Amino acid sequence: RMAPSAVNKQPWKFVVVKSEAARKQLQECYDRDWFKSAPLYIICMRELDSNWIRKEDNKQHGDIDVAIATEHLCLAATERGLGSCWVCNFNVAKETFPYTGFGPIAIIPIGHIADDCPLNEKKRKALEEITDFI
């Protein structure tokens, strides 16, 4: 709730999917075994008509705003010892929790990381490669 957004529009809605029936329904839009093991999901949605647009270049900021809030959510889960994953390549046509005036941006599965989960080291570019100091 504390994430910033362009001109404080807060163009988001978060749908927490907890019940077994609802989870099974949601799993049809992203058919991966690891995804199906999550005890809950959060569908991160953007309000379609509440999108600040920068006048100079018509850049829309709704998706950016939802992304900022979603990452705050993921960081909060991590701080509590939970695992999360940003899923955006789901089949939107099979995402079956429509909310009038909202569109899904990402689905975040959240749960405890299995003890036998292979944790891959994150490959990140060097600071010098992504940052210029002027």
Predicted feature locations:
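Short, conserved aromatic-histidine micro-motifs
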Residues: 35-36, 94-113
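Acidic, glycine-rich active-site loops and adjacent beta-strand->loop/helix elements
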Residues: 20, 48-49, 90-93, 114
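Glycine/charged-rich beta-loop-alpha catalytic/anionic-binding loops adjacent to active sites
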Residues: 23-25, 49-60
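Short, solvent-exposed amphipathic alpha-helical segments in soluble enzyme
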Residues: 31-33, 58-60, 124-125
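N-terminal amphipathic, basic helical "cap/leader" segment at the start of enzyme domains
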Residues: 1-40, 46, 134
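Arginine/glycine-rich "motif VI" loop of SF2 helicases in the C-terminal RecA-like domain
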Residues: 6, 78-79, 100-101
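C-terminal helix-cap and adjacent tail motif
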Residues: 105-134
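Small-aliphatic-rich amphipathic alpha-helix that forms the alpha element of a beta-alpha
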Residues: 42, 57-97, 108
